[in-house]
């Protein structure tokens, strides 16, 4: 048996190929699997459970079907932090806190989306702190739908523009932040996404950091079992 992790799919109506690949993943890859964890940014943008493009309904049905076979867990990303209990219930998913610790086949593990670890990106961290305020979420959720969609479009454009000007180092996780979280959670292993830089990093004191891949050019999943960990590429259309 194994546990699977995916993240950073950035599903949208503009990329039906990614949606189809994820549907195929749900249909073919969940055999001999104890649980599926989605580590955020399942969608390119999510402005509220009351707004969903038509393609989302097919995803809801597929995730719900998967959840009838095994537990499906979700941690919010920076693109879909407004996914709420209503949508999760439709999918049969369990929403997890921003940072979650678990035992994976005898290895103490902490999982998260990963954006909180990019502490050198000061401007983003300031925005993130504002965005996570309860009053800010409430205010945004009560704006007209057209207003929310407009704000989301402007934020995406601003993010793309600013990221082009930021260095590789600033946009990656900060090593001290990684070790601080491992120490705070008393865990040996960390699994996250966000950076789109899949890899398995061996750290000091026998600890390990694993980054799941994005789904822009191909699918990607992390398989964890009693035998170890494996990052697996999932080419589209195969």
Swiss-Prot record:
Family according to the record: Belongs to the LpxH family.
Encoding gene (name): lpxH
Protein task: Hydrolyzes the pyrophosphate bond of UDP-2,3-diacylglucosamine to yield 2,3-diacylglucosamine 1-phosphate (lipid X) and UMP by catalyzing the attack of water at the alpha-P atom. Involved in the biosynthesis of lipid A, a phosphorylated glycolipid that anchors the lipopolysaccharide to the outer membrane of the cell.
Stored HAMAP family: LpxH (MF_00575)
Name used for this protein in its record: UDP-2,3-diacylglucosamine hydrolase
EC number: 3.6.1.54
Localisation per UniProt entry: Cell inner membrane
Binding of substrate, residues: 78-79, 121, 159, 163, 166, 194
UniProt keyword list: Cell inner membrane, Cell membrane, Hydrolase, Lipid A biosynthesis, Lipid biosynthesis, Lipid metabolism, Manganese, Membrane, Metal-binding
Co-factor binding comment: Binds 2 Mn(2+) ions per subunit in a binuclear metal center.
Positions of Mn(2+) 2 binding: 41, 78, 113, 194
Top-level taxon in the UniProt lineage: Bacteria
UniProt topology in membrane: Peripheral membrane protein
Catalytic activity: UDP-2-N,3-O-bis[(3R)-3-hydroxytetradecanoyl]-alpha-D-glucosamine + H2O = 2-N,3-O-bis[(3R)-3-hydroxytetradecanoyl]-alpha-D-glucosaminyl 1-phosphate + UMP + 2 H(+)
Cellular component, GO annotation: cytoplasm; extrinsic component of plasma membrane
UniProt binding sites for Mn(2+) 1: 8, 10, 41, 196
Pathway(s): Glycolipid biosynthesis; lipid IV(A) biosynthesis; lipid IV(A) from (3R)-3-hydroxytetradecanoyl-[acyl-carrier-protein] and UDP-N-acetyl-alpha-D-glucosamine: step 4/6
Cofactor(s) needed by this chain: Mn(2+)
Molecular functions per Gene Ontology: manganese ion binding; UDP-2,3-diacylglucosamine hydrolase activity
Example of a GO biological process term: lipid A biosynthetic process
């Amino acid at each position: 048996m194994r546990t699977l992790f995916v993240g950073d799919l950035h599903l949208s109506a503009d990329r039906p190929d990614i949606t189809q690949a994820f549907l195929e993943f749900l249909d073919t890859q969940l055999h001999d699997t104890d649980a599926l964890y989605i580590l955020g940014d399942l969608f390119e943008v999510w402005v509220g459970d009351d707004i969903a493009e038509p393609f989302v309904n097919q995803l809801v049905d597929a995730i719900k079907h998967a959840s009838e076979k095994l537990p499906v867990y979700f941690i919010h990303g920076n693109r879909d932090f407004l996914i709420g209990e209503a949508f999760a219930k439709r999918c049969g998913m369990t929403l997890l806190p921003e940072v979650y610790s678990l035992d994976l086949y005898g290895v103490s593990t902490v999982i998260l989306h990963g954006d909180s670890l990019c502490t050198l990106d000061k401007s983003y961290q300031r925005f993130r702190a504002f965005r996570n305020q309860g009053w800010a979420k409430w205010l945004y959720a009560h704006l007209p739908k057209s207003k929310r969609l407009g704000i989301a479009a402007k934020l995406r454009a601003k993010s793309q523009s600013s990221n082009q000007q930021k260095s590789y180092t600033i946009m990656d996780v900060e090593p001290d932040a990684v070790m601080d979280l491992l120490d705070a959670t008393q865990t040996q292993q960390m699994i996250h996404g966000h950076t789109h830089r899949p890899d398995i990093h061996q750290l000091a004191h026998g600890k390990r950091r694993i980054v799941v891949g994005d789904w822009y050019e191909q699918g990607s999943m992390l398989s964890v079992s009693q035998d170890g960990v494996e990052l697996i590429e999932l080419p589209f259309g195969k």
